[in-house]
């Protein structure tokens, strides 16, 4: 019988890199997965904070929605304009301090629309585009494929975070009818 220690388990992890097809598939699935997890949330649940160190679901969704056009612009400028330097980390991970400024459904639709544009752009890329190197002031040099892999890993982590926070939302309680309030003895 084999004993699996943490060292053995680490050695068993897949070291396989995401292919371009994997990257495109995962990028295209994030808006739909996010929508599936949160479409039913009301405003109170979007603003519910599980604890002081936890973001609200609304702020996580806003984070993804705000990052999507930044990532799209970064990839478009690198591909179409030949830009060779970009702050990839700033595009992927803008501030977490935002809340949704538009209704949830509108934010999800905007996210899906922007992401469709990005995926349409990526579908036309050949090996030379994926292998194009850009310089990130915080991360050094990386290919556009590596930049997209970072985006996928970051966004999928947020999808898992949304799923987990969603599962921990308190169940609504029916407190019964509101008793009439007497004003001035009446």
Language-model segments: residues:
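Short, contiguous alpha-helical
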Residues: 2-13, 24-25, 45-91, 133-186
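Short, contiguous pre-domain boundary segments
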Residues: 7-19, 94, 100
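Alpha-helical packing segments of well-folded alpha/beta enzyme cores
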Residues: 23-26, 30-34, 67, 71, ...
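Acidic/histidine-rich alpha-helical segments that form the ligand environment
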Residues: 27, 92-135, 146-151
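N-terminal first-folded block
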Residues: 31-33, 37, 41-45
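Conserved catalytic core of Hanks-type protein kinase domains
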Residues: 40, 63-64, 124
């Amino acid at each position: 019988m084999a004993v699996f220690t943490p060292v053995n388990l680490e050695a068993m992890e897949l070291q396989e890199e995401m292919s371009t097809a994997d990257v495109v598939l995962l990028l295209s699935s994030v808006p739909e997965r996010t929508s599936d997890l949160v479409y039913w949330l009301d405003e109170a649940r979007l603003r519910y904070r599980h604890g002081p160190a936890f973001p609200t679901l609304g702020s996580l969704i806003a984070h993804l929605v705000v990052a999507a056009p930044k990532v799209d612009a970064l990839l478009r400028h690198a591909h179409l304009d030949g830009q060779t330097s970009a702050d990839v980390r700033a595009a992927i991970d803008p501030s977490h301090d935002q809340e949704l400024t538009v209704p949830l459904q509108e934010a999800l639709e905007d996210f899906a629309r922007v992401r469709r544009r990005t995926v349409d752009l990526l579908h036309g890329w050949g090996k030379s585009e994926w292998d194009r190197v850009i310089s990130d002031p915080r991360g050094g040099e990386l290919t556009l494929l590596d930049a997209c892999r970072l985006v996928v890993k970051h966004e999928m982590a947020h999808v898992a975070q949304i799923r987990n926070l969603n599962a921990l939302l308190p169940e609504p309680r029916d407190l019964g009818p509101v008793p009439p309030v007497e004003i001035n003895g009446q």
